[in-house]
Amino acid sequence: MKLNRTLVMWLVPILTASCVFGKDYQVRLEPSIMIPMRDGVKLSTDLYFPAEAKGQLPAVLLRTVYGKNKTFGWSGVHQLLVEQGYVVVIQDVRGRYESEGSYVVAEHRREDSYDTVDWLISQGWSNQKVGSAGCSYLGETQVILAAAKHPNHVAAVPMSAASGFYMPGRAWQSFSGGVFELAQTAGWFAASGSQLFYGPPAHIDRGQWFKTPQSRLFKMAPEVDFAAYLELLSTLPTHSLLERAQLPPSEYKSWITSAPDGKFFRNKDLAKPSDTFNVPSLFMDSWYDYGPAETIEMFKTFQRNAQSEQARNNQFLIIGPGTHCDYTESTDDAIVGARNLGDASLNYSALQLQWYDYWLKGKENAITEMPHIQYYVMGKNQWRNSEVWPLASTNYQKWYLSGKGKAQSRTGDGLLSLNLPDNDSRDSYVYDPADPVPSLGGHTCCTGSDTEAGGYDQSEIELRQDVLVYTSPVLIHGFEVTGELKAVLYVSSSALDTDFTVKLVDVYPTGEAYNIQEGAIRMRYRNSLSDSQLIEPGKIYQVEVALNVTSNYFAGGHKLRVEISSSNFPRWERNLNTGGNNYDETNWKTAQNTIYHSAIYPSHLVLPVIIESQ
């Protein structure tokens, strides 16, 4: 397949016509409309109307857990849509903020979203067409609405919505290889998981109260001292972290104590690979977000399981270089973490407006003529496009680990090459849960703390003796890596259970070592993410570590590097090495962990290298 390098040129005729939007309407708010669900529960909903607009209007629905009163101002596209003649509808989900009912994460969402669309199209102002919008949880609710298949839901733009799609062991992005996503999940439940119900006194009409200005002054989210968050995450046991912080009741404990692929997560109201879909969707995500691989799989599932040719032919995917919900406008100097990724300009608001215009207003424009897949190659700092995934020109290369047994730190002898090791060797290190390898950048969100996502220089971390470092010679020729990554390792441990972590790194000629992707495996889940099985100390096991997905150009003069250790904290919960439940324990053991590399035990990294047409 010849890679198309004219994407930016293709975007110009569409976006320049829409970069300066006329302001056709002012905004008129009808706040806190109580919309009834099929079981009688009412959900509080704000309707933002284009003032003075005549005739029937399309609606764009956002369903949020974060509070509808503040959602409208999160993105300029919401106001833009109203000004262009859309009714923007923002709803508190069941049990949150002004809405009635009990709040349980990932339940009642199909029926509630379906019933909300039913109510919208029953209104006299409706043109019978409803789109959906929003990022993160708001993207997730779009995916659930798509799975509900309401016939009047005609366009979706799920942004950073990977948590809405069930993949074994990655439900709600709470685990990686069986290792709990501690900072992200605890941080989210601390800020947004409260099950305390807010409401006015019984003698005051609920609907009328929420229409008063005074009601919008109340801050209903818990106060979280994130300045002390890292210290809190370091305490044990991990299943009672939020209780010790005296935060409101939430489902956090159920999350951390459930098997990564057990009944608890399987029964959650998430879109599943077996679901069918019938809504044209424009998926957006970022390489440094927590779930680009899940977003890609979701995109492919919407295509594969489409109920009509129209739906199948109108699934689109855009993946940029940023972090979670980082859809900034026309970024010509993209700094992601500390990594400069060049001119990643893309007018996301213009794309969304044209998407809704086509599907909800029937305006003829070129939006459906764009490539079905658009992705940003970091390092090369260029937009590319494709019609298939994996890319047709993918060549999976094995990069082997080798050395003479002293790969501890970047000053050691760990080597990464395309050649099988010519000697029988191994590298060992001591993993101490009391002194874990610190997280620095990476692929996470919602922590509320200083554990920010993105690309950062890992060279200081690579001086630790509990980090094995394998580095290639200086690359003579650069190459692009785009697609799913994995490491195949031969390992042993002195413990009954431990973790192994892997990080792919791009080493610049100036010495900076930027993280590209990372993954982990908890040894008890090496065979099944629903059934744990402890290991035999000293026995050698082959394990696969999924490193999600990326697109990065390793330029000539750079080096390819992989780090291996047993912790990445606080992103991932520390394994205490005891073989116990881990989440309810306060004692730990050190473990001697070993990576083997030889012709018999060929530990290696698998990279999807893109072969460019001459």
Named regions from a protein language model:
Residues F21-G55, T471-H477, D531:
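N-terminal cap/lid segment of alpha/beta-hydrolase-fold proteins
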Residues F277, F283-D285:
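Short beta-strand/loop motif that positions the catalytic acidic residue
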Residues G139-H150:
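Short glycine-enriched nucleophile-adjacent loop
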Residues S75, E83, A147-K149, A155-T276:
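Accessory cap/linker subdomain of secreted extracellular hydrolases
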Residues W125-Y137:
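Alpha/beta-hydrolase fold nucleophile elbow
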Residues A51-S122, R170-W172, G178, T328-N340, ...:
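Cap/lid segment of the alpha/beta-hydrolase catalytic domain
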Residues A293-Q315:
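Active-site-adjacent alpha-helix of alpha/beta-hydrolase-fold enzymes
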Residues I204, Q208-S240, Y327, D333-Q614:
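C-terminal, loop-rich substrate-recognition/catalytic regions characterized by aromatic stacking residues
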